[in-house]
């Protein structure tokens, strides 16, 4: 009996040790994952970024701003520093993704700006031009600002903007439109010609008018033929 009790006690001890080892291993894994996440996560920064698309202001942020292919969108930024230290804005870039799936289709060419030294609670205003060389469709525009805080470089995402590339209106002097007009006028001219010709062929010929003899009895002899 004591032998079986001893075996059971040893089994419980081994099982407890195994569970403790698993728990410690899991704890180490969780800590390692947290360390990795902290290492790859972008540094947080308390910066408020607002911008307007010049000439395309809209009160409804859910509506699409309309552009034609190869139009240039001018972004007017208004940036406020809520950090407890000065920061410097020195660059802008960004990306364009499809709506609603979010597939990247283009990068916004990076550009150097400023640099703008922003004090605590300070505000800076500047602009950025983005060429929309895209096919027709609906997209998200997602700008990023590049800033430095001490010796740390941070990338600040601005709010996305919905926009749509639409087909341009057809000009009256567009060659394609002119060709359509020529064909249309040719059809109308041909139909009119054959209609008038058929009406002419169906018109009855005039009968030769009979010459009536004029009563000349009342005329003086001098005027009679």
Swiss-Prot record:
Q: How does it sit in the membrane?
A: Single-pass type I membrane protein
Matching entries from InterPro entries are given as: TRAP_alpha
Question: What keywords are annotated for this sequence in UniProt?
Answer: Endoplasmic reticulum, Membrane, Signal, Transmembrane, Transmembrane helix
Q: Which residues lie on this side of the membrane: Cytoplasmic?
A: 191-225
Q: Where are the transmembrane segments?
A: 170-190
Stretches for region Disordered: 203-225
| Cellular localization per UniProt | Endoplasmic reticulum membrane
Which spans does this entry mark as compositional bias, Basic and acidic residues? 212-225
Which first-to-last residue range defines the signal peptide?
Answer: 1-24
Q: Does the keyword Transmembrane helix apply?
A: yes
Per the record's keyword annotation, is Nuclease included, yes or no? Answer: no
Q: Which residues lie on this side of the membrane: Lumenal?
A: 25-169
Please tell me where this protein is predominantly located. Answer: endoplasmic reticulum
Gene Ontology CC terms: endoplasmic reticulum membrane
One Pfam family this chain carries? TRAP_alpha
Query: What family is it from?
Result: Belongs to the IRC22 family.
Function statement: Is probably involved in a pathway contributing to genomic integrity.
Q: What is this protein called?
A: Increased recombination centers protein 22
- Recorded source organism is Saccharomyces cerevisiae (strain AWRI1631)
């Amino acid at each position: 009996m004591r032998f079986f009790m001893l075996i059971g006690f040893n089994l419980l001890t081994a099982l407890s040790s195994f569970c403790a080892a698993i728990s410690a291993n899991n704890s180490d894994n969780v800590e390692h994952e947290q360390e990795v996440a902290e290492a790859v996560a972008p540094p947080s920064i308390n910066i408020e970024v607002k911008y307007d698309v010049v000439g395309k202001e809209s009160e409804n942020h859910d509506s699409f701003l309309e552009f034609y292919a190869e139009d240039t969108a001018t972004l007017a930024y208004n940036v406020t520093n809520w950090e407890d230290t000065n920061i410097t804005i020195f660059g802008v870039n960004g990306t364009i993704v499809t709506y609603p799936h979010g597939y990247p289709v283009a990068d916004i060419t990076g550009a150097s700006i400023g640099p703008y030294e922003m004090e605590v609670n300070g505000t800076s205003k500047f602009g950025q031009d983005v060429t929309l060389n895209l096919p027709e469709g609906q997209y998200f525009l997602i700008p990023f600002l590049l800033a430095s805080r001490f010796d740390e470089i941070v990338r600040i995402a601005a709010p996305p903007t919905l926009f749509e590339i639409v087909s341009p209106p057809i000009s009256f002097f567009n060659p394609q439109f002119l060709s359509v007009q020529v064909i249309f006028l040719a059809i109308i001219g041909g139909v009119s010609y054959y209609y008038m010709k058929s009406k002419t062929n169906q018109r009855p010929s005039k009968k030769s008018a009979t010459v009536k003899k004029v009563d000349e009895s009342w005329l003086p002899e001098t005027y009679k033929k």
